[in-house]
């Protein structure tokens, strides 16, 4: 990597090589949107000519021989070993190793345990199990990885941490480079703001390895000297706020989330080093159509919808955890689940789909209440909830309780087993995707739906207010409806309107148009949705924004290098 010389130190000239630190990476280990988002970052940067290394805890993936072969994993000749000193004064030994591989041109480094104690944490297959310890040991791993890349002339142009789990590791890596007088910029992305706090001991040289020493912090228009511990104590040990303060640039996934959530919590004065980098999707309508034709012999949305609703007896989706399975099983007869975990069919009608985690944030409890009211006006409406179980059994029980009185209209699929092609087919066939989130930094499910031409009905919160264009605000460019947050009535009205427009413009049935609050061609709305995704939410557009953010961070690092001089 070309380095620019400053008095007594070096800093990158531009961005040629990026380190992406993350706990999730699609194709390695991923639970939700973070893994897909970081993979889009990495592969998009690669398309722009940036060499990318993704660094993640192993989560035990190196034990899977098939996976190891598929990414050509091989052990690296580097070990991080030492002792952490606990608050109890005892020493806790760690021994960390590394596996190196490649996935679609992106270099992977998996951080693993080399003894049973270390492996019990870094290699735990549950991504977020023992989370504070995984995050701490990932930071300790930098003590060996940084000298290794220095010796092999592989110094990154930027270190990019994604969410708080990798923040201390990224800051520690930057500190280790600066010990060698190389000012590598640190970029921090907040995908979802978390209020995680620890005492200084957690981050310190005793535990996670961060040495307390002077550091330059950007204060509105100049860098000022502080120390890592002083910054930590200033923010009360809040890891997200600490990472933002330490960063050369930080990003969030939407302007609304940055303005309404992030800056009010970290400080408006930090806006000068902020960036907005949208997530992206690789969903395409062509892929949905090909699968629909191959699997169901239908590419027309209405025809596919009919076949999918009739095909439900062939869909077997067994929940992965006992609590979810038990909740559904006990009510199976009233919610259309058969004894073999297949589903009773549904009759044809306007279809609304929900996808995402079954958690309070995502608002499925609000949706099921709104849908009950929809049926008063559109009796043949259908709702399919395709949810990822979260362990919130009270919320799931509430869904089941309400769905039990709508046996002929609602199906709940609570399993991770539904393949991407089938998920895409359900969304493609839908009248609309409904996203009733109480808060949403970005809303990738909405973008995925629009990518296959499915309009979105959402609460007008945070990122959803940017991804979805309300038809009432712009009939020419609208992609769906944004309604008042947590309003069951407005959500119902939007769903009834979508059903009316879909029937009128896709089936020639205008019998419901008296209930619609706008009159627009639903086919045109579908086209608008696809155009919007192609212009704003594709991998290349995301990578260009991210690269601009990296270059802002490079300038900041150069300013710090000048301050050092």
What function would you assign to each model-found segment?
Residues 1-565:
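Catalytic cores of nucleotide-sugar-dependent glycosyltransferases that transfer UDP/GDP/TDP-activated
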